[in-house]
Amino acid sequence: MNTFKELSNLKGRRALVTGATGNLGKVIANTLAELGADLMLVDQPGSDFDSLTAQLTERWGVAITHHFCDLELQIQRTELMAQVNKSSSGLNILVNNAAFVGTSDLTGWNVPFEQQTLATWRRALELNLTAIFDLCQGFTPMLQAAEGASIINIASTYGMFAPVWSLYAGTTMGNPAAYGASKGGLIQFTRWLATTLAPAVRVNCISPGGIWRNQPDEFVTRYAARTPMKRMATEGDMRGAVAYFACDLSNYVTGQNLAVDGGWGVW
């Protein structure tokens, strides 16, 4: 029987993380690097990979490459997959983290329903769902050939539950329809893909609860009061779930959606 240390060791495995320079992406990259995985970091053109790569290399000593890619554009996704497929290092772990979120600066996004635009709805579904379908499909041959292959999709509790609008009263915050729709679709796609790629590739999903990012005090207070753990989440709260699904501790787990929400969904 392998030890827990052996089961959690990702040395010799390679992980691709999208949205790698964002708040959650950096935490995911650090988590996988700490467990020994070599990394391919992906984010949109103009992203600052240099400081993140330097920090990860100095701290964990893993091999790191990075790729600029606007995942909203199919042509750039195709180029990314071609570059990765040409490499000889393989791919063991795919983390689909990049997404438009509730605070994204988009026209017709974080506004009342009557003002949400069809163009922005389409953009959100393209990045939050279609791009993930595309990457999973394109990387399937590499993953099927790899040891301990795992796909981790980052969804949201808003893909599971409707928004509680009273939390937003008196603030300029919103909850776009396309966000919940795309994340709900991602959760179901995770289940579908898990049955399709098993047993060679495990496919699981993490649904964070609300993450604290300097929201208005009244929103934070209301959110915390409704949450059994009495606070909002932090990016660091996702580390355990990422590590679990990435490594062999979860080698008999697939098709699951793990809500890391402080108990939000239990009532």
Q: Which residue stretches match the model-derived regions?
A:
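Short, small/polar-rich loop/turn modules that mediate ligand/substrate recognition or access, typified
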Residues: 148, 198-202, 253-255
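Conserved glycine-rich cofactor-binding loop
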Residues: 14, 21-22
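Short C-terminal tail/terminal secondary-structure segment
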Residues: 2-7, 163-166, 170, 243, ...
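Conserved NAD(P)H cofactor-binding loop of Rossmann-fold oxidoreductase domains
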Residues: 97-109, 263
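Active-site Tyr-X3-Lys motif and surrounding loop/helix of classical short-chain dehydrogenase/reductase
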Residues: 79-86, 105-126, 222
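Conserved glycine-rich Rossmann-like NAD(P)H-binding loop of the short-chain dehydrogenase/reductase
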Residues: 35-51
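Catalytic loop of short-chain dehydrogenase/reductase
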Residues: 114, 118-120, 144, 152-198, ...
